[in-house]
Every structure is written in C-alpha cells, then in structure tokens.
C-alpha cells in the first residue's frame, strides 16, 4: 500500500532517538499518520515542521498499519512564519485545529484546498491571514457537517443587515430581529459575508474567532470530550489583546 501527494505537515512528535511520528493532510487522502525515520535529525528535521508544504510518500505493507512517511520540502511555511508572532500563532492554530478536528484517513478536499495558499501568504503578513484562517475554520465546520447558515436572517428571512449569529442554530440574525436577544447572540463580522474591505481590524478578527471557535468547541471538539487546542486559544487571546491595545490608544 502506498500513495504520494502534496501534503501539509500538521505535527511531528519525537519517537525514539531520531525518529518522529508525523501527521500530514492531503487533498485526496485526508489526515494520515506515519513513522518518519530520522525525522528529528539535523538533515531532515526542518522538513517536518508543522505548517510546511511537502511532497509526501506514505507506504505500508497493509492498509491498516501505521505506515512510514518520507517527504521532500515544497514550501517552508514554518520557517517563514518565525519572524512574526501573529503569523506563527495563525500557523500553529491552523495545524492543531486541522489535526484535532479531521477524522483519520477520510478525504476532505474542500478543507485542504485553501490551506496551501493560506500558508504561503503567511510570509506576507497583515491581518488578511487572520481573516483567511477564520474563513477556513468556517469551511472546516461545513465539511464536517456543522456549517453556519449566513445567507439570510433566521427570523425575518431578510438578506441584509446580518450582524449576529444564533449560538443555538448557527444561523444569521439581522440587527432588527436581534434586539430582544442581543446578550445571547454572537457577533458576525462582515468579512465572513464577503465584505472584507469594511472591517479588517482586530475587533472583527476577535469576533470571527469567537464565532467559529464557539461551534468548533461545541460541535467538533466537544463531541470528542476535548477542549479547543491550546494554540487556537492562544491565537484568540493574542487578538483579544490587540483589541484592548487599540481601545486604549483610541
């Protein structure tokens, strides 16, 4: 049994003196794990950094075995993100959420396709990568069967003025209909409605992370009796701190 495909490295844990157990994500194969011989060595360790795009080859004698992984580096996203704490936080969050949420050996191409481009753009910096990461989490929720319905208001059916989401149903709510339940609803940032130019700021990023994080926590990680990954919570905390800094200097 074997396959070869472009993959994103999601994790690599030391195993023995020089080997590691790696998790990779590809378009056609989904999330796969395997043993990497010499994966922590000086020569190969840089390849297996979470976030890197690699051309990976998985082999095993039987389909249900752990198997072995080898790879060649395509794009060193991990190294390029090191110079910017926010970019690094985004990268770590993406990798840990993907590994924790995706089922093993099950293809989810819609969740994979945006990731290589997103990871490549990390080196460019800017808040766009945060928005892209939140959009990707919304795609992941949809792929796993928990998609948000942001097309029209759940109460009135109107398609404009959508500024909130019901935490119970995951459906959008307009400002007019939201008034009686404002303290219970989740803010809906405009960039999730394809209006990126209107609110590219830390407050919108915080609201977006809170929104997708709520449903990831309840519907994906919660059903497995696990919390959101620490790297995902750390990204939210970093963005929340940015909003406080901006408020103090306003």
Swiss-Prot record:
Gene Ontology cellular-component annotations: bacterial nucleoid
Keywords recorded for this protein, A-Z: DNA damage, DNA recombination, DNA repair
GO biological process: DNA recombination; double-strand break repair
InterPro entries linked: ARFGAP/RecO, DNA_rep/recomb_RecO_N, NA-bd_OB-fold, RecO, RecO_C
Pfam families linked: RecO_C (PF02565), RecO_N (PF11967)
DNA repair as UniProt keyword: yes
Record keyword DNA damage present: yes
Source organism, top-level taxon: Bacteria
Gene3D superfamilies linked: Nucleic acid-binding proteins, Recombination protein O, C-terminal domain
Signal peptide: none
NCBIfam families with a match to the protein in the record: reco (TIGR00613)
Functional note: Involved in DNA repair and RecF pathway recombination.
Alphabetized PANTHER family for the sequence: DNA REPAIR PROTEIN RECO
Protein name from the UniProt record: DNA repair protein RecO
Organism: Granulibacter bethesdensis (strain ATCC BAA-1260 / CGDNIH1)
């Amino acid at each position: 049994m074997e396959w070869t495909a472009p993959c994103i490295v999601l994790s690599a844990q030391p195993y023995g003196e020089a080997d590691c157990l790696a998790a990779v994500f590809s378009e056609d194969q989904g999330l796969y794990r395997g043993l990497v011989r010499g994966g922590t060595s000086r020569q190969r360790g840089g390849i297996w950094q979470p976030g890197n795009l690699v051309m990976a080859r998985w082999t095993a004698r039987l389909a249900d075995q752990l198997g072995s992984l080898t790879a060649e580096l395509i794009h060193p996203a991990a190294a390029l993100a090191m110079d910017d704490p926010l970019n690094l936080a985004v990268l770590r969050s993406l990798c840990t959420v993907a590994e924790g949420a995706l089922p093993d050996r099950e293809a989810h191409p819609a969740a994979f396709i945006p990731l290589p481009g997103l990871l490549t753009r990390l080196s460019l910096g800017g808040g766009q990568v945060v928005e892209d990461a939140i959009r990707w989490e919304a795609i992941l929720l949809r792929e796993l069967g928990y998609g948000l319905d942001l097309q029209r208001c759940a109460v009135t059916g109107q398609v404009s003025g959508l500024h909130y989401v019901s935490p119970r149903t995951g459906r959008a709510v307009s400002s007019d209909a939201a008034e009686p339940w404002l303290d219970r609803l989740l803010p809906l940032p405009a960039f999730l409605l394809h209006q990126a130019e209107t609110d590219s700021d830390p407050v919108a990023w915080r609201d977006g992370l809170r929104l997708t994080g709520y449903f990831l926590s309840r519907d994906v990680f919660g059903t497995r009796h696990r919390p959101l990954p620490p790297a995902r919570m750390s990204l939210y905390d970093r963005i929340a701190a940015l909003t406080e800094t901006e408020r103090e200097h306003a």
